[in-house]
């Protein structure tokens, strides 16, 4: 074979490999974002809530009233957008993010979609979710290359369900409408809320200030994954800068962290950029 012929064969081979890579990337990206849209539809099509609960402790009813939830609420989903910073491990540099989230009101379900610029021109897409009996955390570079994929299992479900419970401060109508939540009054400023059955059972505490706003959340045993190892760790969050939006009293600032050997590690800090509530039946 001549030198020219060898060059042609190599060029064709490289072109073929490039074409295969492009097709693979397109298929992977379409699969990933198609999955996101499927999860989104599932949360948005959550069932229409039944009448507000009448079996709640008076302290929970008082909190709902404080947050602006009317007795005749028929809220179905909450939609919000966020911006902020995340830290992957103690001492790491902060990663800026923007996110949008849909949270179901009458059942434990949500989808969080975030975009983090790892470096110039290299975004990471992250989804965190509970939908039906499925829960997961996934991240993809460019929406093509999977970096993290943790899904299903009772431990995963517990962790994500605990996030739903912690975010009741952004989902106040769920206090009256979500019959999957079990409440206990621990003292005048502490409410415990739980959900799930069997090995999926989980509980957090909502800490109120003197005015009755939720300013802190706590859990003793939220699953934390490091590599392939999962351990239960103390978990906490703080909230503040309450404002009234669409009749609901919502904290615009929040941060979340782990308590590691009695030292706080804040891994998420964010701000609510927009918030809205959708009510009534699915159209």
Summary of predicted features, one role per range:
Residues 100-105, 127-129, 179-186, 206, ...:
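Short, exposed beta-strand/loop patches in secreted or surface proteins that constitute
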Residues 192-279:
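Gly/Pro-enriched, hydrophobic low-complexity segments
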Residues 32-79:
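N-terminal leader/targeting segments and the immediate start of mature chains
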Residues 138-197, 230:
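Flexible, processing/modification-adjacent segments and terminal tails
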Residues 1-7:
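Short, Lys/Arg-rich N-terminal segment immediately upstream of the first membrane anchor
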Residues 62-65, 69-145:
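N-terminal mature ectodomain segment of secretory-pathway/periplasmic proteins
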Residues 74-81, 105-113, 135, 185-194, ...:
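Short, hydrophobic/aromatic-rich segments at coil-to-beta transitions
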Residues 7-24:
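Hydrophobic alpha-helical topogenic segments used for membrane insertion/localization
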């Amino acid at each position: 074979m001549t030198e020219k012929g060898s060059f042609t064969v190599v060029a064709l081979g490289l072109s073929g490999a490039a074409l295969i890579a492009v097709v693979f990337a397109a298929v992977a990206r379409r699969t990933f974002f198609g999955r996101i849209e499927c999860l989104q539809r599932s949360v948005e099509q959550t069932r229409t809530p039944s009448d507000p609960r009448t079996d709640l402790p008076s302290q929970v009813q008082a909190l709902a009233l404080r947050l602006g939830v009317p007795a005749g609420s028929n809220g179905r989903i909450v939609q919000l957008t966020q911006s902020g910073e995340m830290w992957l491990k103690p001492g790491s540099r902060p990663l800026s993010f923007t996110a949008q989230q849909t949270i179901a009101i009458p059942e434990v379900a949500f989808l969080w979609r975030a975009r983090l610029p790892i470096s110039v021109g290299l975004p990471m897409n992250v989804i965190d979710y509970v939908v039906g009996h499925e829960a997961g955390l996934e991240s993809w570079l460019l929406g093509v290359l999977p970096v993290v994929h943790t899904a299903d299992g009772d431990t995963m479900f517990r962790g994500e369900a605990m996030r739903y419970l912690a975010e009741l401060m952004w989902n106040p109508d769920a206090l009256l409408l979500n019959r999957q939540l079990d409440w206990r009054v621990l003292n005048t400023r502490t409410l415990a809320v739980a959900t799930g059955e069997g090995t999926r059972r989980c509980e957090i505490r909502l800490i109120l200030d003197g005015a009755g706003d939720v300013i802190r959340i706590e859990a003793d045993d939220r699953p934390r994954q490091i590599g392939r190892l999962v351990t239960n760790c103390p978990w906490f969050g703080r909230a503040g800068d309450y404002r009234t939006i669409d009749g609901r009293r919502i904290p615009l600032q929040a941060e979340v962290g782990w308590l590691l050997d009695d030292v706080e590690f804040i891994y998420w800090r964010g701000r609510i950029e927009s918030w809205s509530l959708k009510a009534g039946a699915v159209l």
